[in-house]
Amino acid sequence: MTHVLVLSRNYPNSVFPSLGLWAERLVQAAAPVADCTVVAPVPWAPPLLRLRSAQRFRAVPAAERGVGGVPVIHPRVMALPGTRLHGLDARMQFPSVRAVAEQVHRERPVDLIHAHFIYPEGVMAARLGRRWQVPVVTSEHALWLPWLDQWPAVRRQVVLAAPNIARVLAVSRAVQDTIHAILGPEAHTGLLPNAVDEQVFRAPAPGEHRDTNQILFVGAVRHVKGLDVLVRALAALAHERPALRVLVLGEAFYGQWRRDEDAVKRLCHEVGVADRVIFEGRATPERVAAAMRSSAALVVPGRRESFSAVAIEALASGTPVVATRCGGPEDFLSEVTGTLVPPEDPAALAAGIRSVLDRGEPFDPAALHRIAVTGFGMGVTTSRVEMLYREILAGGGRR
């Protein structure tokens, strides 16, 4: 069976179990057609550094087995705090990644490298692929613009690496458009959306309770995710829906994310909805799925979203989605599955929530589940991955 080296900083581990679940699901989907070894770098934390984040990074094991017994290796890499030296990430991390990858390749030759994100993973993967003479593909989970316009040093590395990448895969058309804006119309790109595990995210069973006064937000509380916009929308709905509340499921991994979360909590007090926004913190996929089935709607209020895996998970759970037109959700959301509204507009978001909650003809949970599984289930994703790997290994897709 094809041996694939998966390179991704974002991958679940025993300390951060919800980190990069979308990468893990693609590995699960690939399991019937490929043997994957995952290299998931972790920031090196000096022994005397007592920050909570440093202690957690140190607790990540050097190697472990992921879902399905997939070997996951965690080399320690140099990672400076903040983004000031972002352009040096690939250079600083490559020695540690190369050492581990070379050992994997010696023990069993790698046939293909699949990196998640073009930088730094894709840039490092391109160097390994050139060294081993094996093809490289990258999955792109972020919009390249305005990011690469803001980081010219990173942009140069991406453009230089691109000729050594057989296929640059986007999770949505919005991401694909930004890739072509950087690499040109001739770039070999493709679409490989995120997958949903329909065994976890199932439609509600007959008689399963749904709380019509609960709407759900799932994800890290980062400014770009727009929870502040949802809080203002909730305040706008307060007089007509005094019982409506928001359940927030998600963990702030990093310092800036925690500061963003604190800012949202202050906003909740300022606009008078602190008692109706419940921050539950980290949640397992099973807890998220249960909350989706029991909520009236999932709200995705993002300023920018490359895909929105949680929206697909909600549909698979039989729950409609209110989302902003922020990039990825436009590929699969419509009036059949919920509604789309402009970003950064609390009044429009409130109107969208109102329209979904007040819909005359209720959404059919079984129909929403079918839509999600048909387009993004594990079975269809396995077929996509198999076709992709077969084509790449046959020599297709070179720029």
Predicted ranges, named:
Residues L5, G207-K225, V231-L234, L247-L249:
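Conserved donor-binding/catalytic core segment of Leloir-type glycosyltransferases
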Residues L21, V123, F217-A236, R259-D262, ...:
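A conserved mid-protein helix/loop that constitutes part of the nucleotide-sugar donor-binding site
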Residues A174, A195:
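Carbohydrate-associated surface elements
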Residues L227, V231-I278, E286:
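A conserved nucleotide-sugar
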Residues R282, A290-S295:
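Short alpha-helical donor nucleotide-sugar binding micro-motif in glycosyltransferases
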Residues R303:
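Aromatic "clamp/platform" in nucleotide-sugar-dependent glycosyltransferases that forms part
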Residues P320-A323:
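Short hydrophobic beta-strand element within catalytic cores of glycosyltransferases
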Residues S334-P346, S355-E361:
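Conserved acidic donor-binding segment of nucleotide-sugar-dependent glycosyltransferases
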